[in-house]
């Protein structure tokens, strides 16, 4: 059995169960590109190890994601008789330290939105206006980048201040309320980007300079340029600099911090946040609780240091 048809068979099987399976499918196709469309019999443990380690050649959180995806694929292939045994490492390495996402501050946003138009290269896929609007949408809604990029005109209800999010990670649609400020941002953006006479309006709200849907890779690449231009950097030991996906983490943590400060029962509110974010279950949302408590603790510590410093100078 060749690898390519087996992978396609497996992806169709997972999608038939109601899962879009986009991210794991991308990993399997990367595995196929690396090994080529070989027979299962030609696969070796070395091929699998090389894919798991990736280009960096070291164990990261991506190693465990790839391991999980390949494990599911090999179990499926074994059940279909494509292979006799799974070709995964017998020992699991120690997990790397927990990844800590970057939480954007209002000052970070001011810097990102304040980069002058003249600093943008004409070759950038996204115009300055589109880039700023995309950042405001992500910051104000916590949407995944792909969800924001796929948002269609008919899915924006200005009267009800509501977005309809379809084609989600888990194949479920959801309604996302938005604030008045973001409604104004989107309404003005649409007015500025009305199609010229004789041209059709692009199906998606946000588009590239040539009227195409925004691709994740293009947006990520342009954001890394913008982040450096704006001086938004992290100086801790994290492997990654701030990313577009961190706006989703920022939204979740900011919402939890607000509830804590309002004296709300955060545990009872957590299912609402889980639904809003389109999570598969509450466990996925619970990871933000520890992160939020750490942020509040650090904020309290900073406040105490400030107070004591003022007393010392009195």
Where are each of the predicted segments found?
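Conserved catalytic core of the tyrosine transesterase superfamily
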Residues: 1-314
